[in-house]
Structure formats: structure tokens, C-alpha cells
Regions:
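Compositionally biased, intrinsically disordered low-complexity segments enriched
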Residues: 15, 43-45, 335
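Charged catalytic cores and adjacent phosphate/nucleic-acid-binding surfaces used
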Residues: 2, 21-38, 57, 115-125, ...
Length: 359
């Protein structure tokens, strides 16, 4: 008896020590909001994934995420010979672990159909069993009745859209007309669909990016090829489930994948400004000025198309600084650049104006 009692604290200590390595992410912010790092599309053994649900929480914590959704398929259970079909099981198993790790666990499911309509995640649902319906529209209706955020997943996935080009079908237009579609994956797994930027802009939908992980995340997005999984950045009033949901319906989202950020035009400029700072010129030789440009984020900023009298291209490294030497005229007018890795449309990147700080 005595032996058992002493074993308990040692076991707890080992558990805490093994899990105590969270990566802190530095990403752009929107003034007045907190940036929540999120992955809203992942699978477990309860559909076609290969991991137990609580592993998703540990992975998310180590990866520096704030919120996740486990979205097992409603209509596809390849492991059912060994694991019973239970659409709430993953959420039930992962919930207490999420509470221990301070991870916001959104309850979700993936409605899984042929294209059209394809695959759609229902997020913030309460009763996944109610989505088990032959009629697709009835399944979405049931989700929406629970206050769901409906995300159209990987619309250009080659298994369903062989040329990789996403297309809106009548069923998607019908969903939009009813107010039953709220976001589209611009980025999924390791691929992205440029036209989704325009679809979201034209239809007032949130742009989303998720891992759609089925195996172990650190193996599917392994270093050195990947420094982080693809994720949705959500600009919420607070770090709570309610604020997260409000922000998503209000379309305050961006997608971070590789060294790129995809964001709606109206959010892109403030996001860039939140991490890039131009210093006061520290040298002036009467013809040219020298000033520093620094970046506090994990995302290098790749500038091109600079005007005459300034560098044509500049990369401000992640957590780094460069010195800009430019014509003195830029004391009175901004230096203009395209930011090649901040994507605002299928054919557009962010344009910025940079002015050295005033003395
Ligand atoms: Zn999926």
C-alpha cells in the first residue's frame, strides 16, 4: 500500500515533464484583438486517422496552438471492425485533456460527400449524431440549427476535382444564399487553392487553413521542410470559445502556411504593420539616408518592386532586421513595396508604404 502511494506523485511528475515543451509562436496581430492559432481539421482513429484523440491535444499544445477541432468523418469509418462508431467519442476523450492544457476544443464533424458538394466541416456543433442523414442539405440544416460554422474543405482536392481548380456548384451557391456556408479552406494539408481567396472575398466568407492531419503531426509536417503546420489565425476579442466563434463568423481570419500569410485585403496591411517597424534614420549624408527595418514575427517579409532610389528587393528576416539605404527624398514620401508573401487575392499581394520614423 505504501509503495503505491509514493508511485502516484512520481508518475504525475514524469507526465508533466514529458509534456512541458510548448513552442511559442510569434505571428501578426490586429489592433484590439488577440491572435488565436488554430487548426480546425484533423482526424483520429474514430474515422480514418491513426492516432487516439488525446494525442491531438498534446500535439496542439506543443505546436503552440490555442484552439483545435477534431473533425472525424460522419460517413466514413474504415476502422469500425475494431473501433465502434461514435461521432462524439473523440470529443469526449479529448475534452478533459484539452482542459488540462488550456486548449480550446471545438466540437466538430466532417460531412463527407462526393463533389458536389464535397467535404464540409461543421464546427461548434453539439450533437454530431444529428448530422447522420442521407439528404446533404438536411445534414447541414441540422448543423446550422446548432449554431454551426460551416467550412467547405479542400475544394480543389484532386481526388474530387482532377484539375485541382475549385469550382462553385449550384449546391454551394444555395448554401451561401441560405447563409449556411461561412468559410472555405484556402489551404489544406500541403496544397492551396488560389481562387478561394476571390471566392471568399466575393461571397463574404472566412478564409481557412488547416492540416487535415491523419497521422502524427510531427511526422506529416517534419523539420526541416516544415517549421510549423498550416493554421488558421483568428483575430478574437478574447481567448475564449465564444470570442473565437464570433471572430470566425465576422471573417477575421488569415492563413499561415510555410513563409506565407493569406489574408483579406482589409486585414493584410494592419497585420504587416503589427510586426514591421521602421526606425529613425541613423545616418544622413546629404544625398541618402540609412534606417533600420525590423520584424518581430516568425514570418520573413519578402518585399519587391521598390522604387528608384531604394532597394528593389528586401527580405526582412523572421525576428531580424535589415538596414535600408535610400534616397533622401524618402524623408518626405514613403517607400512603396509589394509584399510577395502576403497574399490578398488569387492574383494579388499586399502593397505597402514604408516611411522611416520621424525624430
Ligand atoms: Zn478531413
Amino acid at each position: 500500500m505504501k509503495t503505491k502511494l509514493t508511485l502516484i506523485p512520481i508518475f504525475l511528475l514524469i507526465t508533466l515533464t514529458l509534456s512541458a515543451q510548448r513552442h511559442i509562436l510569434s505571428v501578426p496581430e490586429l489592433p484590439g484583438y488577440v491572435t488565436l492559432k488554430c487548426d480546425f481539421h484533423m482526424h483520429t482513429v474514430f474515422s480514418d486517422g491513426n492516432v487516439w484523440p488525446n494525442q491531438r491535444v498534446g500535439e496542439a499544445w506543443r505546436d503552440g496552438l490555442d484552439a483545435i477541432a477534431i473533425t472525424d468523418h460522419i460517413e466514413y469509418q474504415p476502422h469500425k471492425q475494431y473501433i465502434p462508431v461514435d461521432h462524439s467519442a473523440a470529443w469526449k476523450i479529448a475534452s478533459p485533456i484539452a482542459a488540462d492544457y488550456n486548449i480550446i476544443l471545438v466540437k466538430g464533424s466532417e460531412i463527407t460527400r462526393k463533389m458536389p458538394p464535397g467535404h464540409l466541416n461543421a464546427l461548434f456543433i453539439t450533437e454530431p449524431d444529428s448530422l447522420v442523414k442521407d439528404d446533404f442539405m438536411k445534414a447541414v440544416e441540422a448543423a446550422v440549427a446548432q449554431g454551426a460554422f460551416i467550412e467547405w474543405n479542400h475544394p480543389g482536392w484532386k481526388s474530387q476535382q482532377p484539375d485541382g481548380i475549385p469550382r462553385m456548384y449550384d449546391v454551394h451557391r444555395e448554401l451561401i444564399a441560405k447563409g449556411w456556408l461561412h468559410g472555405i479552406e484556402y489551404y489544406n494539408d500541403v496544397e492551396y487553392y488560389p481562387l478561394v481567396m476571390d471566392m471568399c472575398r466575393d461571397n463574404q466568407l472566412a478564409i481557412m487553413g488547416n492540416s487535415d492531419v491523419h497521422g502524427v503531426i510531427s511526422e506529416e509536417f517534419a523539420a526541416p521542410v516544415y517549421s510549423h503546420r498550416p493554421m488558421t489565425l483568428v483575430f478574437a476579442k478574447e481567448r475564449t470559445m465564444e470570442s473565437l466563434k464570433e471572430a470566425m463568423f465576422a471573417r477575421r481570419t488569415a492563413v499561415w502556411y510555410g513563409d506565407n500569410l493569406a489574408a483579406p485585403e482589409e486585414l493584410a496591411a494592419p497585420l504587416f504593420q503589427s510586426v514591421i517597424t521602421a526606425g529613425i534614420p541613423f545616418r544622413d549624408d546629404g544625398k541618402r539616408i540609412w534606417f533600420e527595418l525590423s520584424n518581430t514575427s516568425d514570418i520573413p517579409m519578402k518585399l519587391s518592386g521598390g522604387p528608384e532610389g531604394a532597394p528593389a528587393t528586401l527580405t526582412v528576416p523572421a525576428h531580424g532586421m535589415v538596414v535600408v539605404r535610400a534616397d533622401r527624398k524618402f524623408l518626405a514620401q514613403p517607400v512603396t513595396y509589394a509584399v510577395d508573401n502576403i497574399i490578398t487575392g488569387s492574383n494579388n499581394v499586399l502593397k505597402v508604404e514604408i516611411s522611416p520614423a520621424k525624430k
